[in-house]
Design a protein with these regions (language model features):
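Nucleic-acid-binding surface
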Residues: 3-7, 17, 35-180
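Basic amphipathic alpha-helical segments that dock to polyanions
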Residues: 18-25
Length: 180
């Protein structure tokens, strides 16, 4: 289990007892403000605790959905446009307008670590929106993987989501030409 400092205060009762638990190796300080009863904690678990409202997106979401075997160097996290800058070398922050942030948001689970991630349907829209920014080979790999699972996806949900984004006609046209 992973805790913030405030959660440790609730659990142990005082800063003194937290320090005592640390000294007795009942609790480990993972990084500033993050503690765990286990010595080894995944980066994903740390980031979901530190940034609970952030949503895995882009390269990270493509990887966790099994659409690419390229392990991202950074964790791509979507936050509301009005959010403050997240200062963390492990992440790439993607600002998303408030009216679009929750579209396709779902909960994922990786080895008991729960996290927010965009659905495969939402990520297909993101792939089509940002195809000119992504490396061509990477884009093609993910697109081909989408073609293989297209019958598992909810097409009406994709169309509904796409209509809420700017340049929705371009997204829908690319969906029809390149995926369906």
């Amino acid at each position: 289990m992973i805790y913030t400092y405030d959660e440790c205060l609730d659990k142990y009762g005082s800063d003194y007892l937290i320090k005592k638990a640390l000294k007795e190796n009942k609790l480990y300080k993972i990084e500033k403000g993050i503690y765990s009863e286990n010595k080894n904690v995944s980066v994903l678990e740390i980031l979901t605790k530190r940034y609970p409202k952030a949503i895995l997106t882009m390269n990270t979401a493509f990887y966790y959905h099994g659409l690419t075997d390229v392990i991202p160097e950074l964790y791509y996290l979507a936050t509301v446009s009005s959010s403050k800058k997240l200062v963390d070398k492990r992440i790439k922050q993607i600002y998303v307008p408030e009216d679009l942030i929750d579209i396709g948001k779902e909960e994922g689970n990786n080895n008991g670590v729960k996290y927010n991630i965009y659905s495969k349907e939402r990520m297909l829209i993101e792939l089509l929106r940002f195809k000119n920014i992504l490396p061509y080979d990477y884009y093609k790999e993910i697109l081909n993987n989408y073609r293989e699972i297209i019958y598992e996806l909810n097409i009406s949900k994709i169309e509904k989501y796409a209509k809420q984004f700017p340049k929705s006609k371009m997204i829908l046209e690319a969906l029809r030409k390149e995926v369906l």
